[in-house]
């Protein structure tokens, strides 16, 4: 039970931080750098909601930040429908796909490829085969990724190889 609670709390903490970043960006000058930051926050939020939905099914959606000023305000949380959850996931990932570069010089950052991969995974969950295929084909056509020899895939010396769309940089 403690691992389940840990996952639930952690995912909603990530979602909360993402909501804060997304909301704060609304008051700033629109720049490519800001759009990239918001895109990464939306990727974290989409990934967290996808993991929560796959694990628990009945989850609540929160897209508003919870600063100290409104922490005690009443909110109407209810179990979101599958459509509501995946509409938000798709919306967040579409924003990221539009605003992120295909690759990053900083290993472990969300990129357009990672956002497309997450959208393909979400589409698989929904049996949305056309969207799945579209996302995977776009990754393949990008020219940034390719298969490598099997004995190199899990070589600890270089996990950030051309087959990896995104590698978390911690263990």
Specify the residue positions occupied by each region the protein language model found.
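An aromatic- and glycine-enriched ligand-binding surface/loop that stacks and positions planar moieties
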Residues: 1, 86, 90-97, 109-171
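Conserved, well-structured interaction surfaces
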Residues: 1-56, 80-84, 93-107
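Flexible, active-site-adjacent loop/turn segments at secondary-structure boundaries
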Residues: 6, 54, 59-60, 75, ...
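Glycine-rich, histidine-containing beta strand-loop boundary motifs that form or position
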Residues: 45, 50-52, 63-65, 151, ...
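Short, well-structured active-site flanking segments
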Residues: 53-65, 129-136
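Short coil/linker segments at helix-helix boundaries
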Residues: 58-83
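Short, glycine/acidic-rich hinge or "gate" loops at secondary-structure transitions
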Residues: 62, 106-110
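A broadly tuned preference for mixed-charge, low-complexity surface segments
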Residues: 66-67, 71, 102-103, 168-171
